[in-house]
C-alpha cells in the first residue's frame, strides 16, 4: 500500500476558491476488455451526451478500440460509517486489481475517465477523486462544488492505494464495496447536468 497525503493552504489575505482532482491513471495489463470500475455510488451522471450513450455500461471497459472518443462519468460516492469510501479497478478474471480509499469529507466526488482507444493512442482509464467534477469554476459554482479556503486555512486529503493480487484479495474489495452500497440504491442519470 501507498498513501498520498496532500495539504493545500491559502497563504493569501483573502478567501480563495480552489478545486483539486487526483488523476490516477491505469492501463494494461490491469485494464483490459471486461475490466470493471468498482465503487459504492450514490449517483452517476454522464459528463456529456457522448457519455450518455454508454451509461448502462459505464463501469465496464471495452478492448482497445481505434478512434474511441473518451467518456467521462461524474459520481457521488457512498461511504462507510467512518466517512471513508473505497473504489477500484479490477481485471476481467477478478484476480488483479487496485483499490483507492479516501474520506468523502476531503474528496466528495469521483470522476471516471475512460479512454479505451488503441494502445498506441493511450488505452487508459483515470479514477479521479476530487473536490469537484472536471468543469470550469463557473459551472461548478452553479452546483455548489467549489470550496473556499479562508486566509491561512488548509485543506488536507489522503488517498490509500493498494495493489490486489489473487481472487481472494479482489473478492475482499468487492465484498467491502457491496457492503457500503447496501446503504443506498444508486441513482444512474441518463442525461448530463444542465451546464447553461
Language model: regions and residue ranges:
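Short solvent-exposed strand-capping/beta-turn motif centered on an Asx-Ser/Thr pair
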Residues: 9-14, 92, 164-166
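Hydrophobic residues positioned within well-ordered beta-strands of beta-sheet architectures
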Residues: 4, 20-22, 85-87, 125, ...
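Active-site/ligand-binding surface loops and adjacent short beta/alpha elements
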Residues: 27-28, 32-104
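Active-site pocket scaffolds in enzymes
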Residues: 96-196
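Short beta-strand elements of extracellular/lumenal beta-sandwich folds
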Residues: 2-9, 90, 113, 119
Amino acid at each position: 500500500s501507498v498513501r498520498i497525503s496532500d495539504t493545500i493552504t491559502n497563504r493569501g489575505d483573502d478567501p480563495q476558491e480552489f478545486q483539486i482532482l487526483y488523476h490516477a491513471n491505469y492501463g494494461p495489463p490491469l485494464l483490459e476488455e471486461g475490466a470493471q470500475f468498482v465503487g459504492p455510488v450514490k449517483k452517476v451522471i454522464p459528463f456529456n451526451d457522448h457519455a450518455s450513450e454508454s451509461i448502462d455500461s459505464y463501469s465496464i471497459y471495452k478492448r482497445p478500440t481505434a478512434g474511441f472518443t473518451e467518456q467521462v462519468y461524474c459520481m457521488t460516492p457512498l461511504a462507510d460509517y467512518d466517512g471513508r469510501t473505497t473504489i477500484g479497478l479490477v481485471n476481467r478474471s477478478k484476480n488483479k486489481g487496485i483499490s483507492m480509499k479516501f474520506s468523502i469529507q476531503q474528496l466528495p466526488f469521483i470522476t471516471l475517465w475512460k479512454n479505451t482507444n488503441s494502445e498506441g493512442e493511450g488505452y487508459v482509464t483515470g479514477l479521479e477523486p476530487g473536490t469537484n467534477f472536471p468543469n470550469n469554476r463557473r459551472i461548478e459554482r452553479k452546483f455548489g462544488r467549489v470550496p473556499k479556503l479562508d486566509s491561512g486555512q488548509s485543506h488536507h486529503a489522503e488517498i490509500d492505494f493498494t495493489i490486489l493480487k489473487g481472487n481472494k484479495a479482489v473478492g475482499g474489495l468487492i465484498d467491502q464495496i457491496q457492503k457500503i452500497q447496501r446503504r443506498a440504491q444508486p441513482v444512474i442519470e441518463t442525461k448530463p447536468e444542465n451546464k447553461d
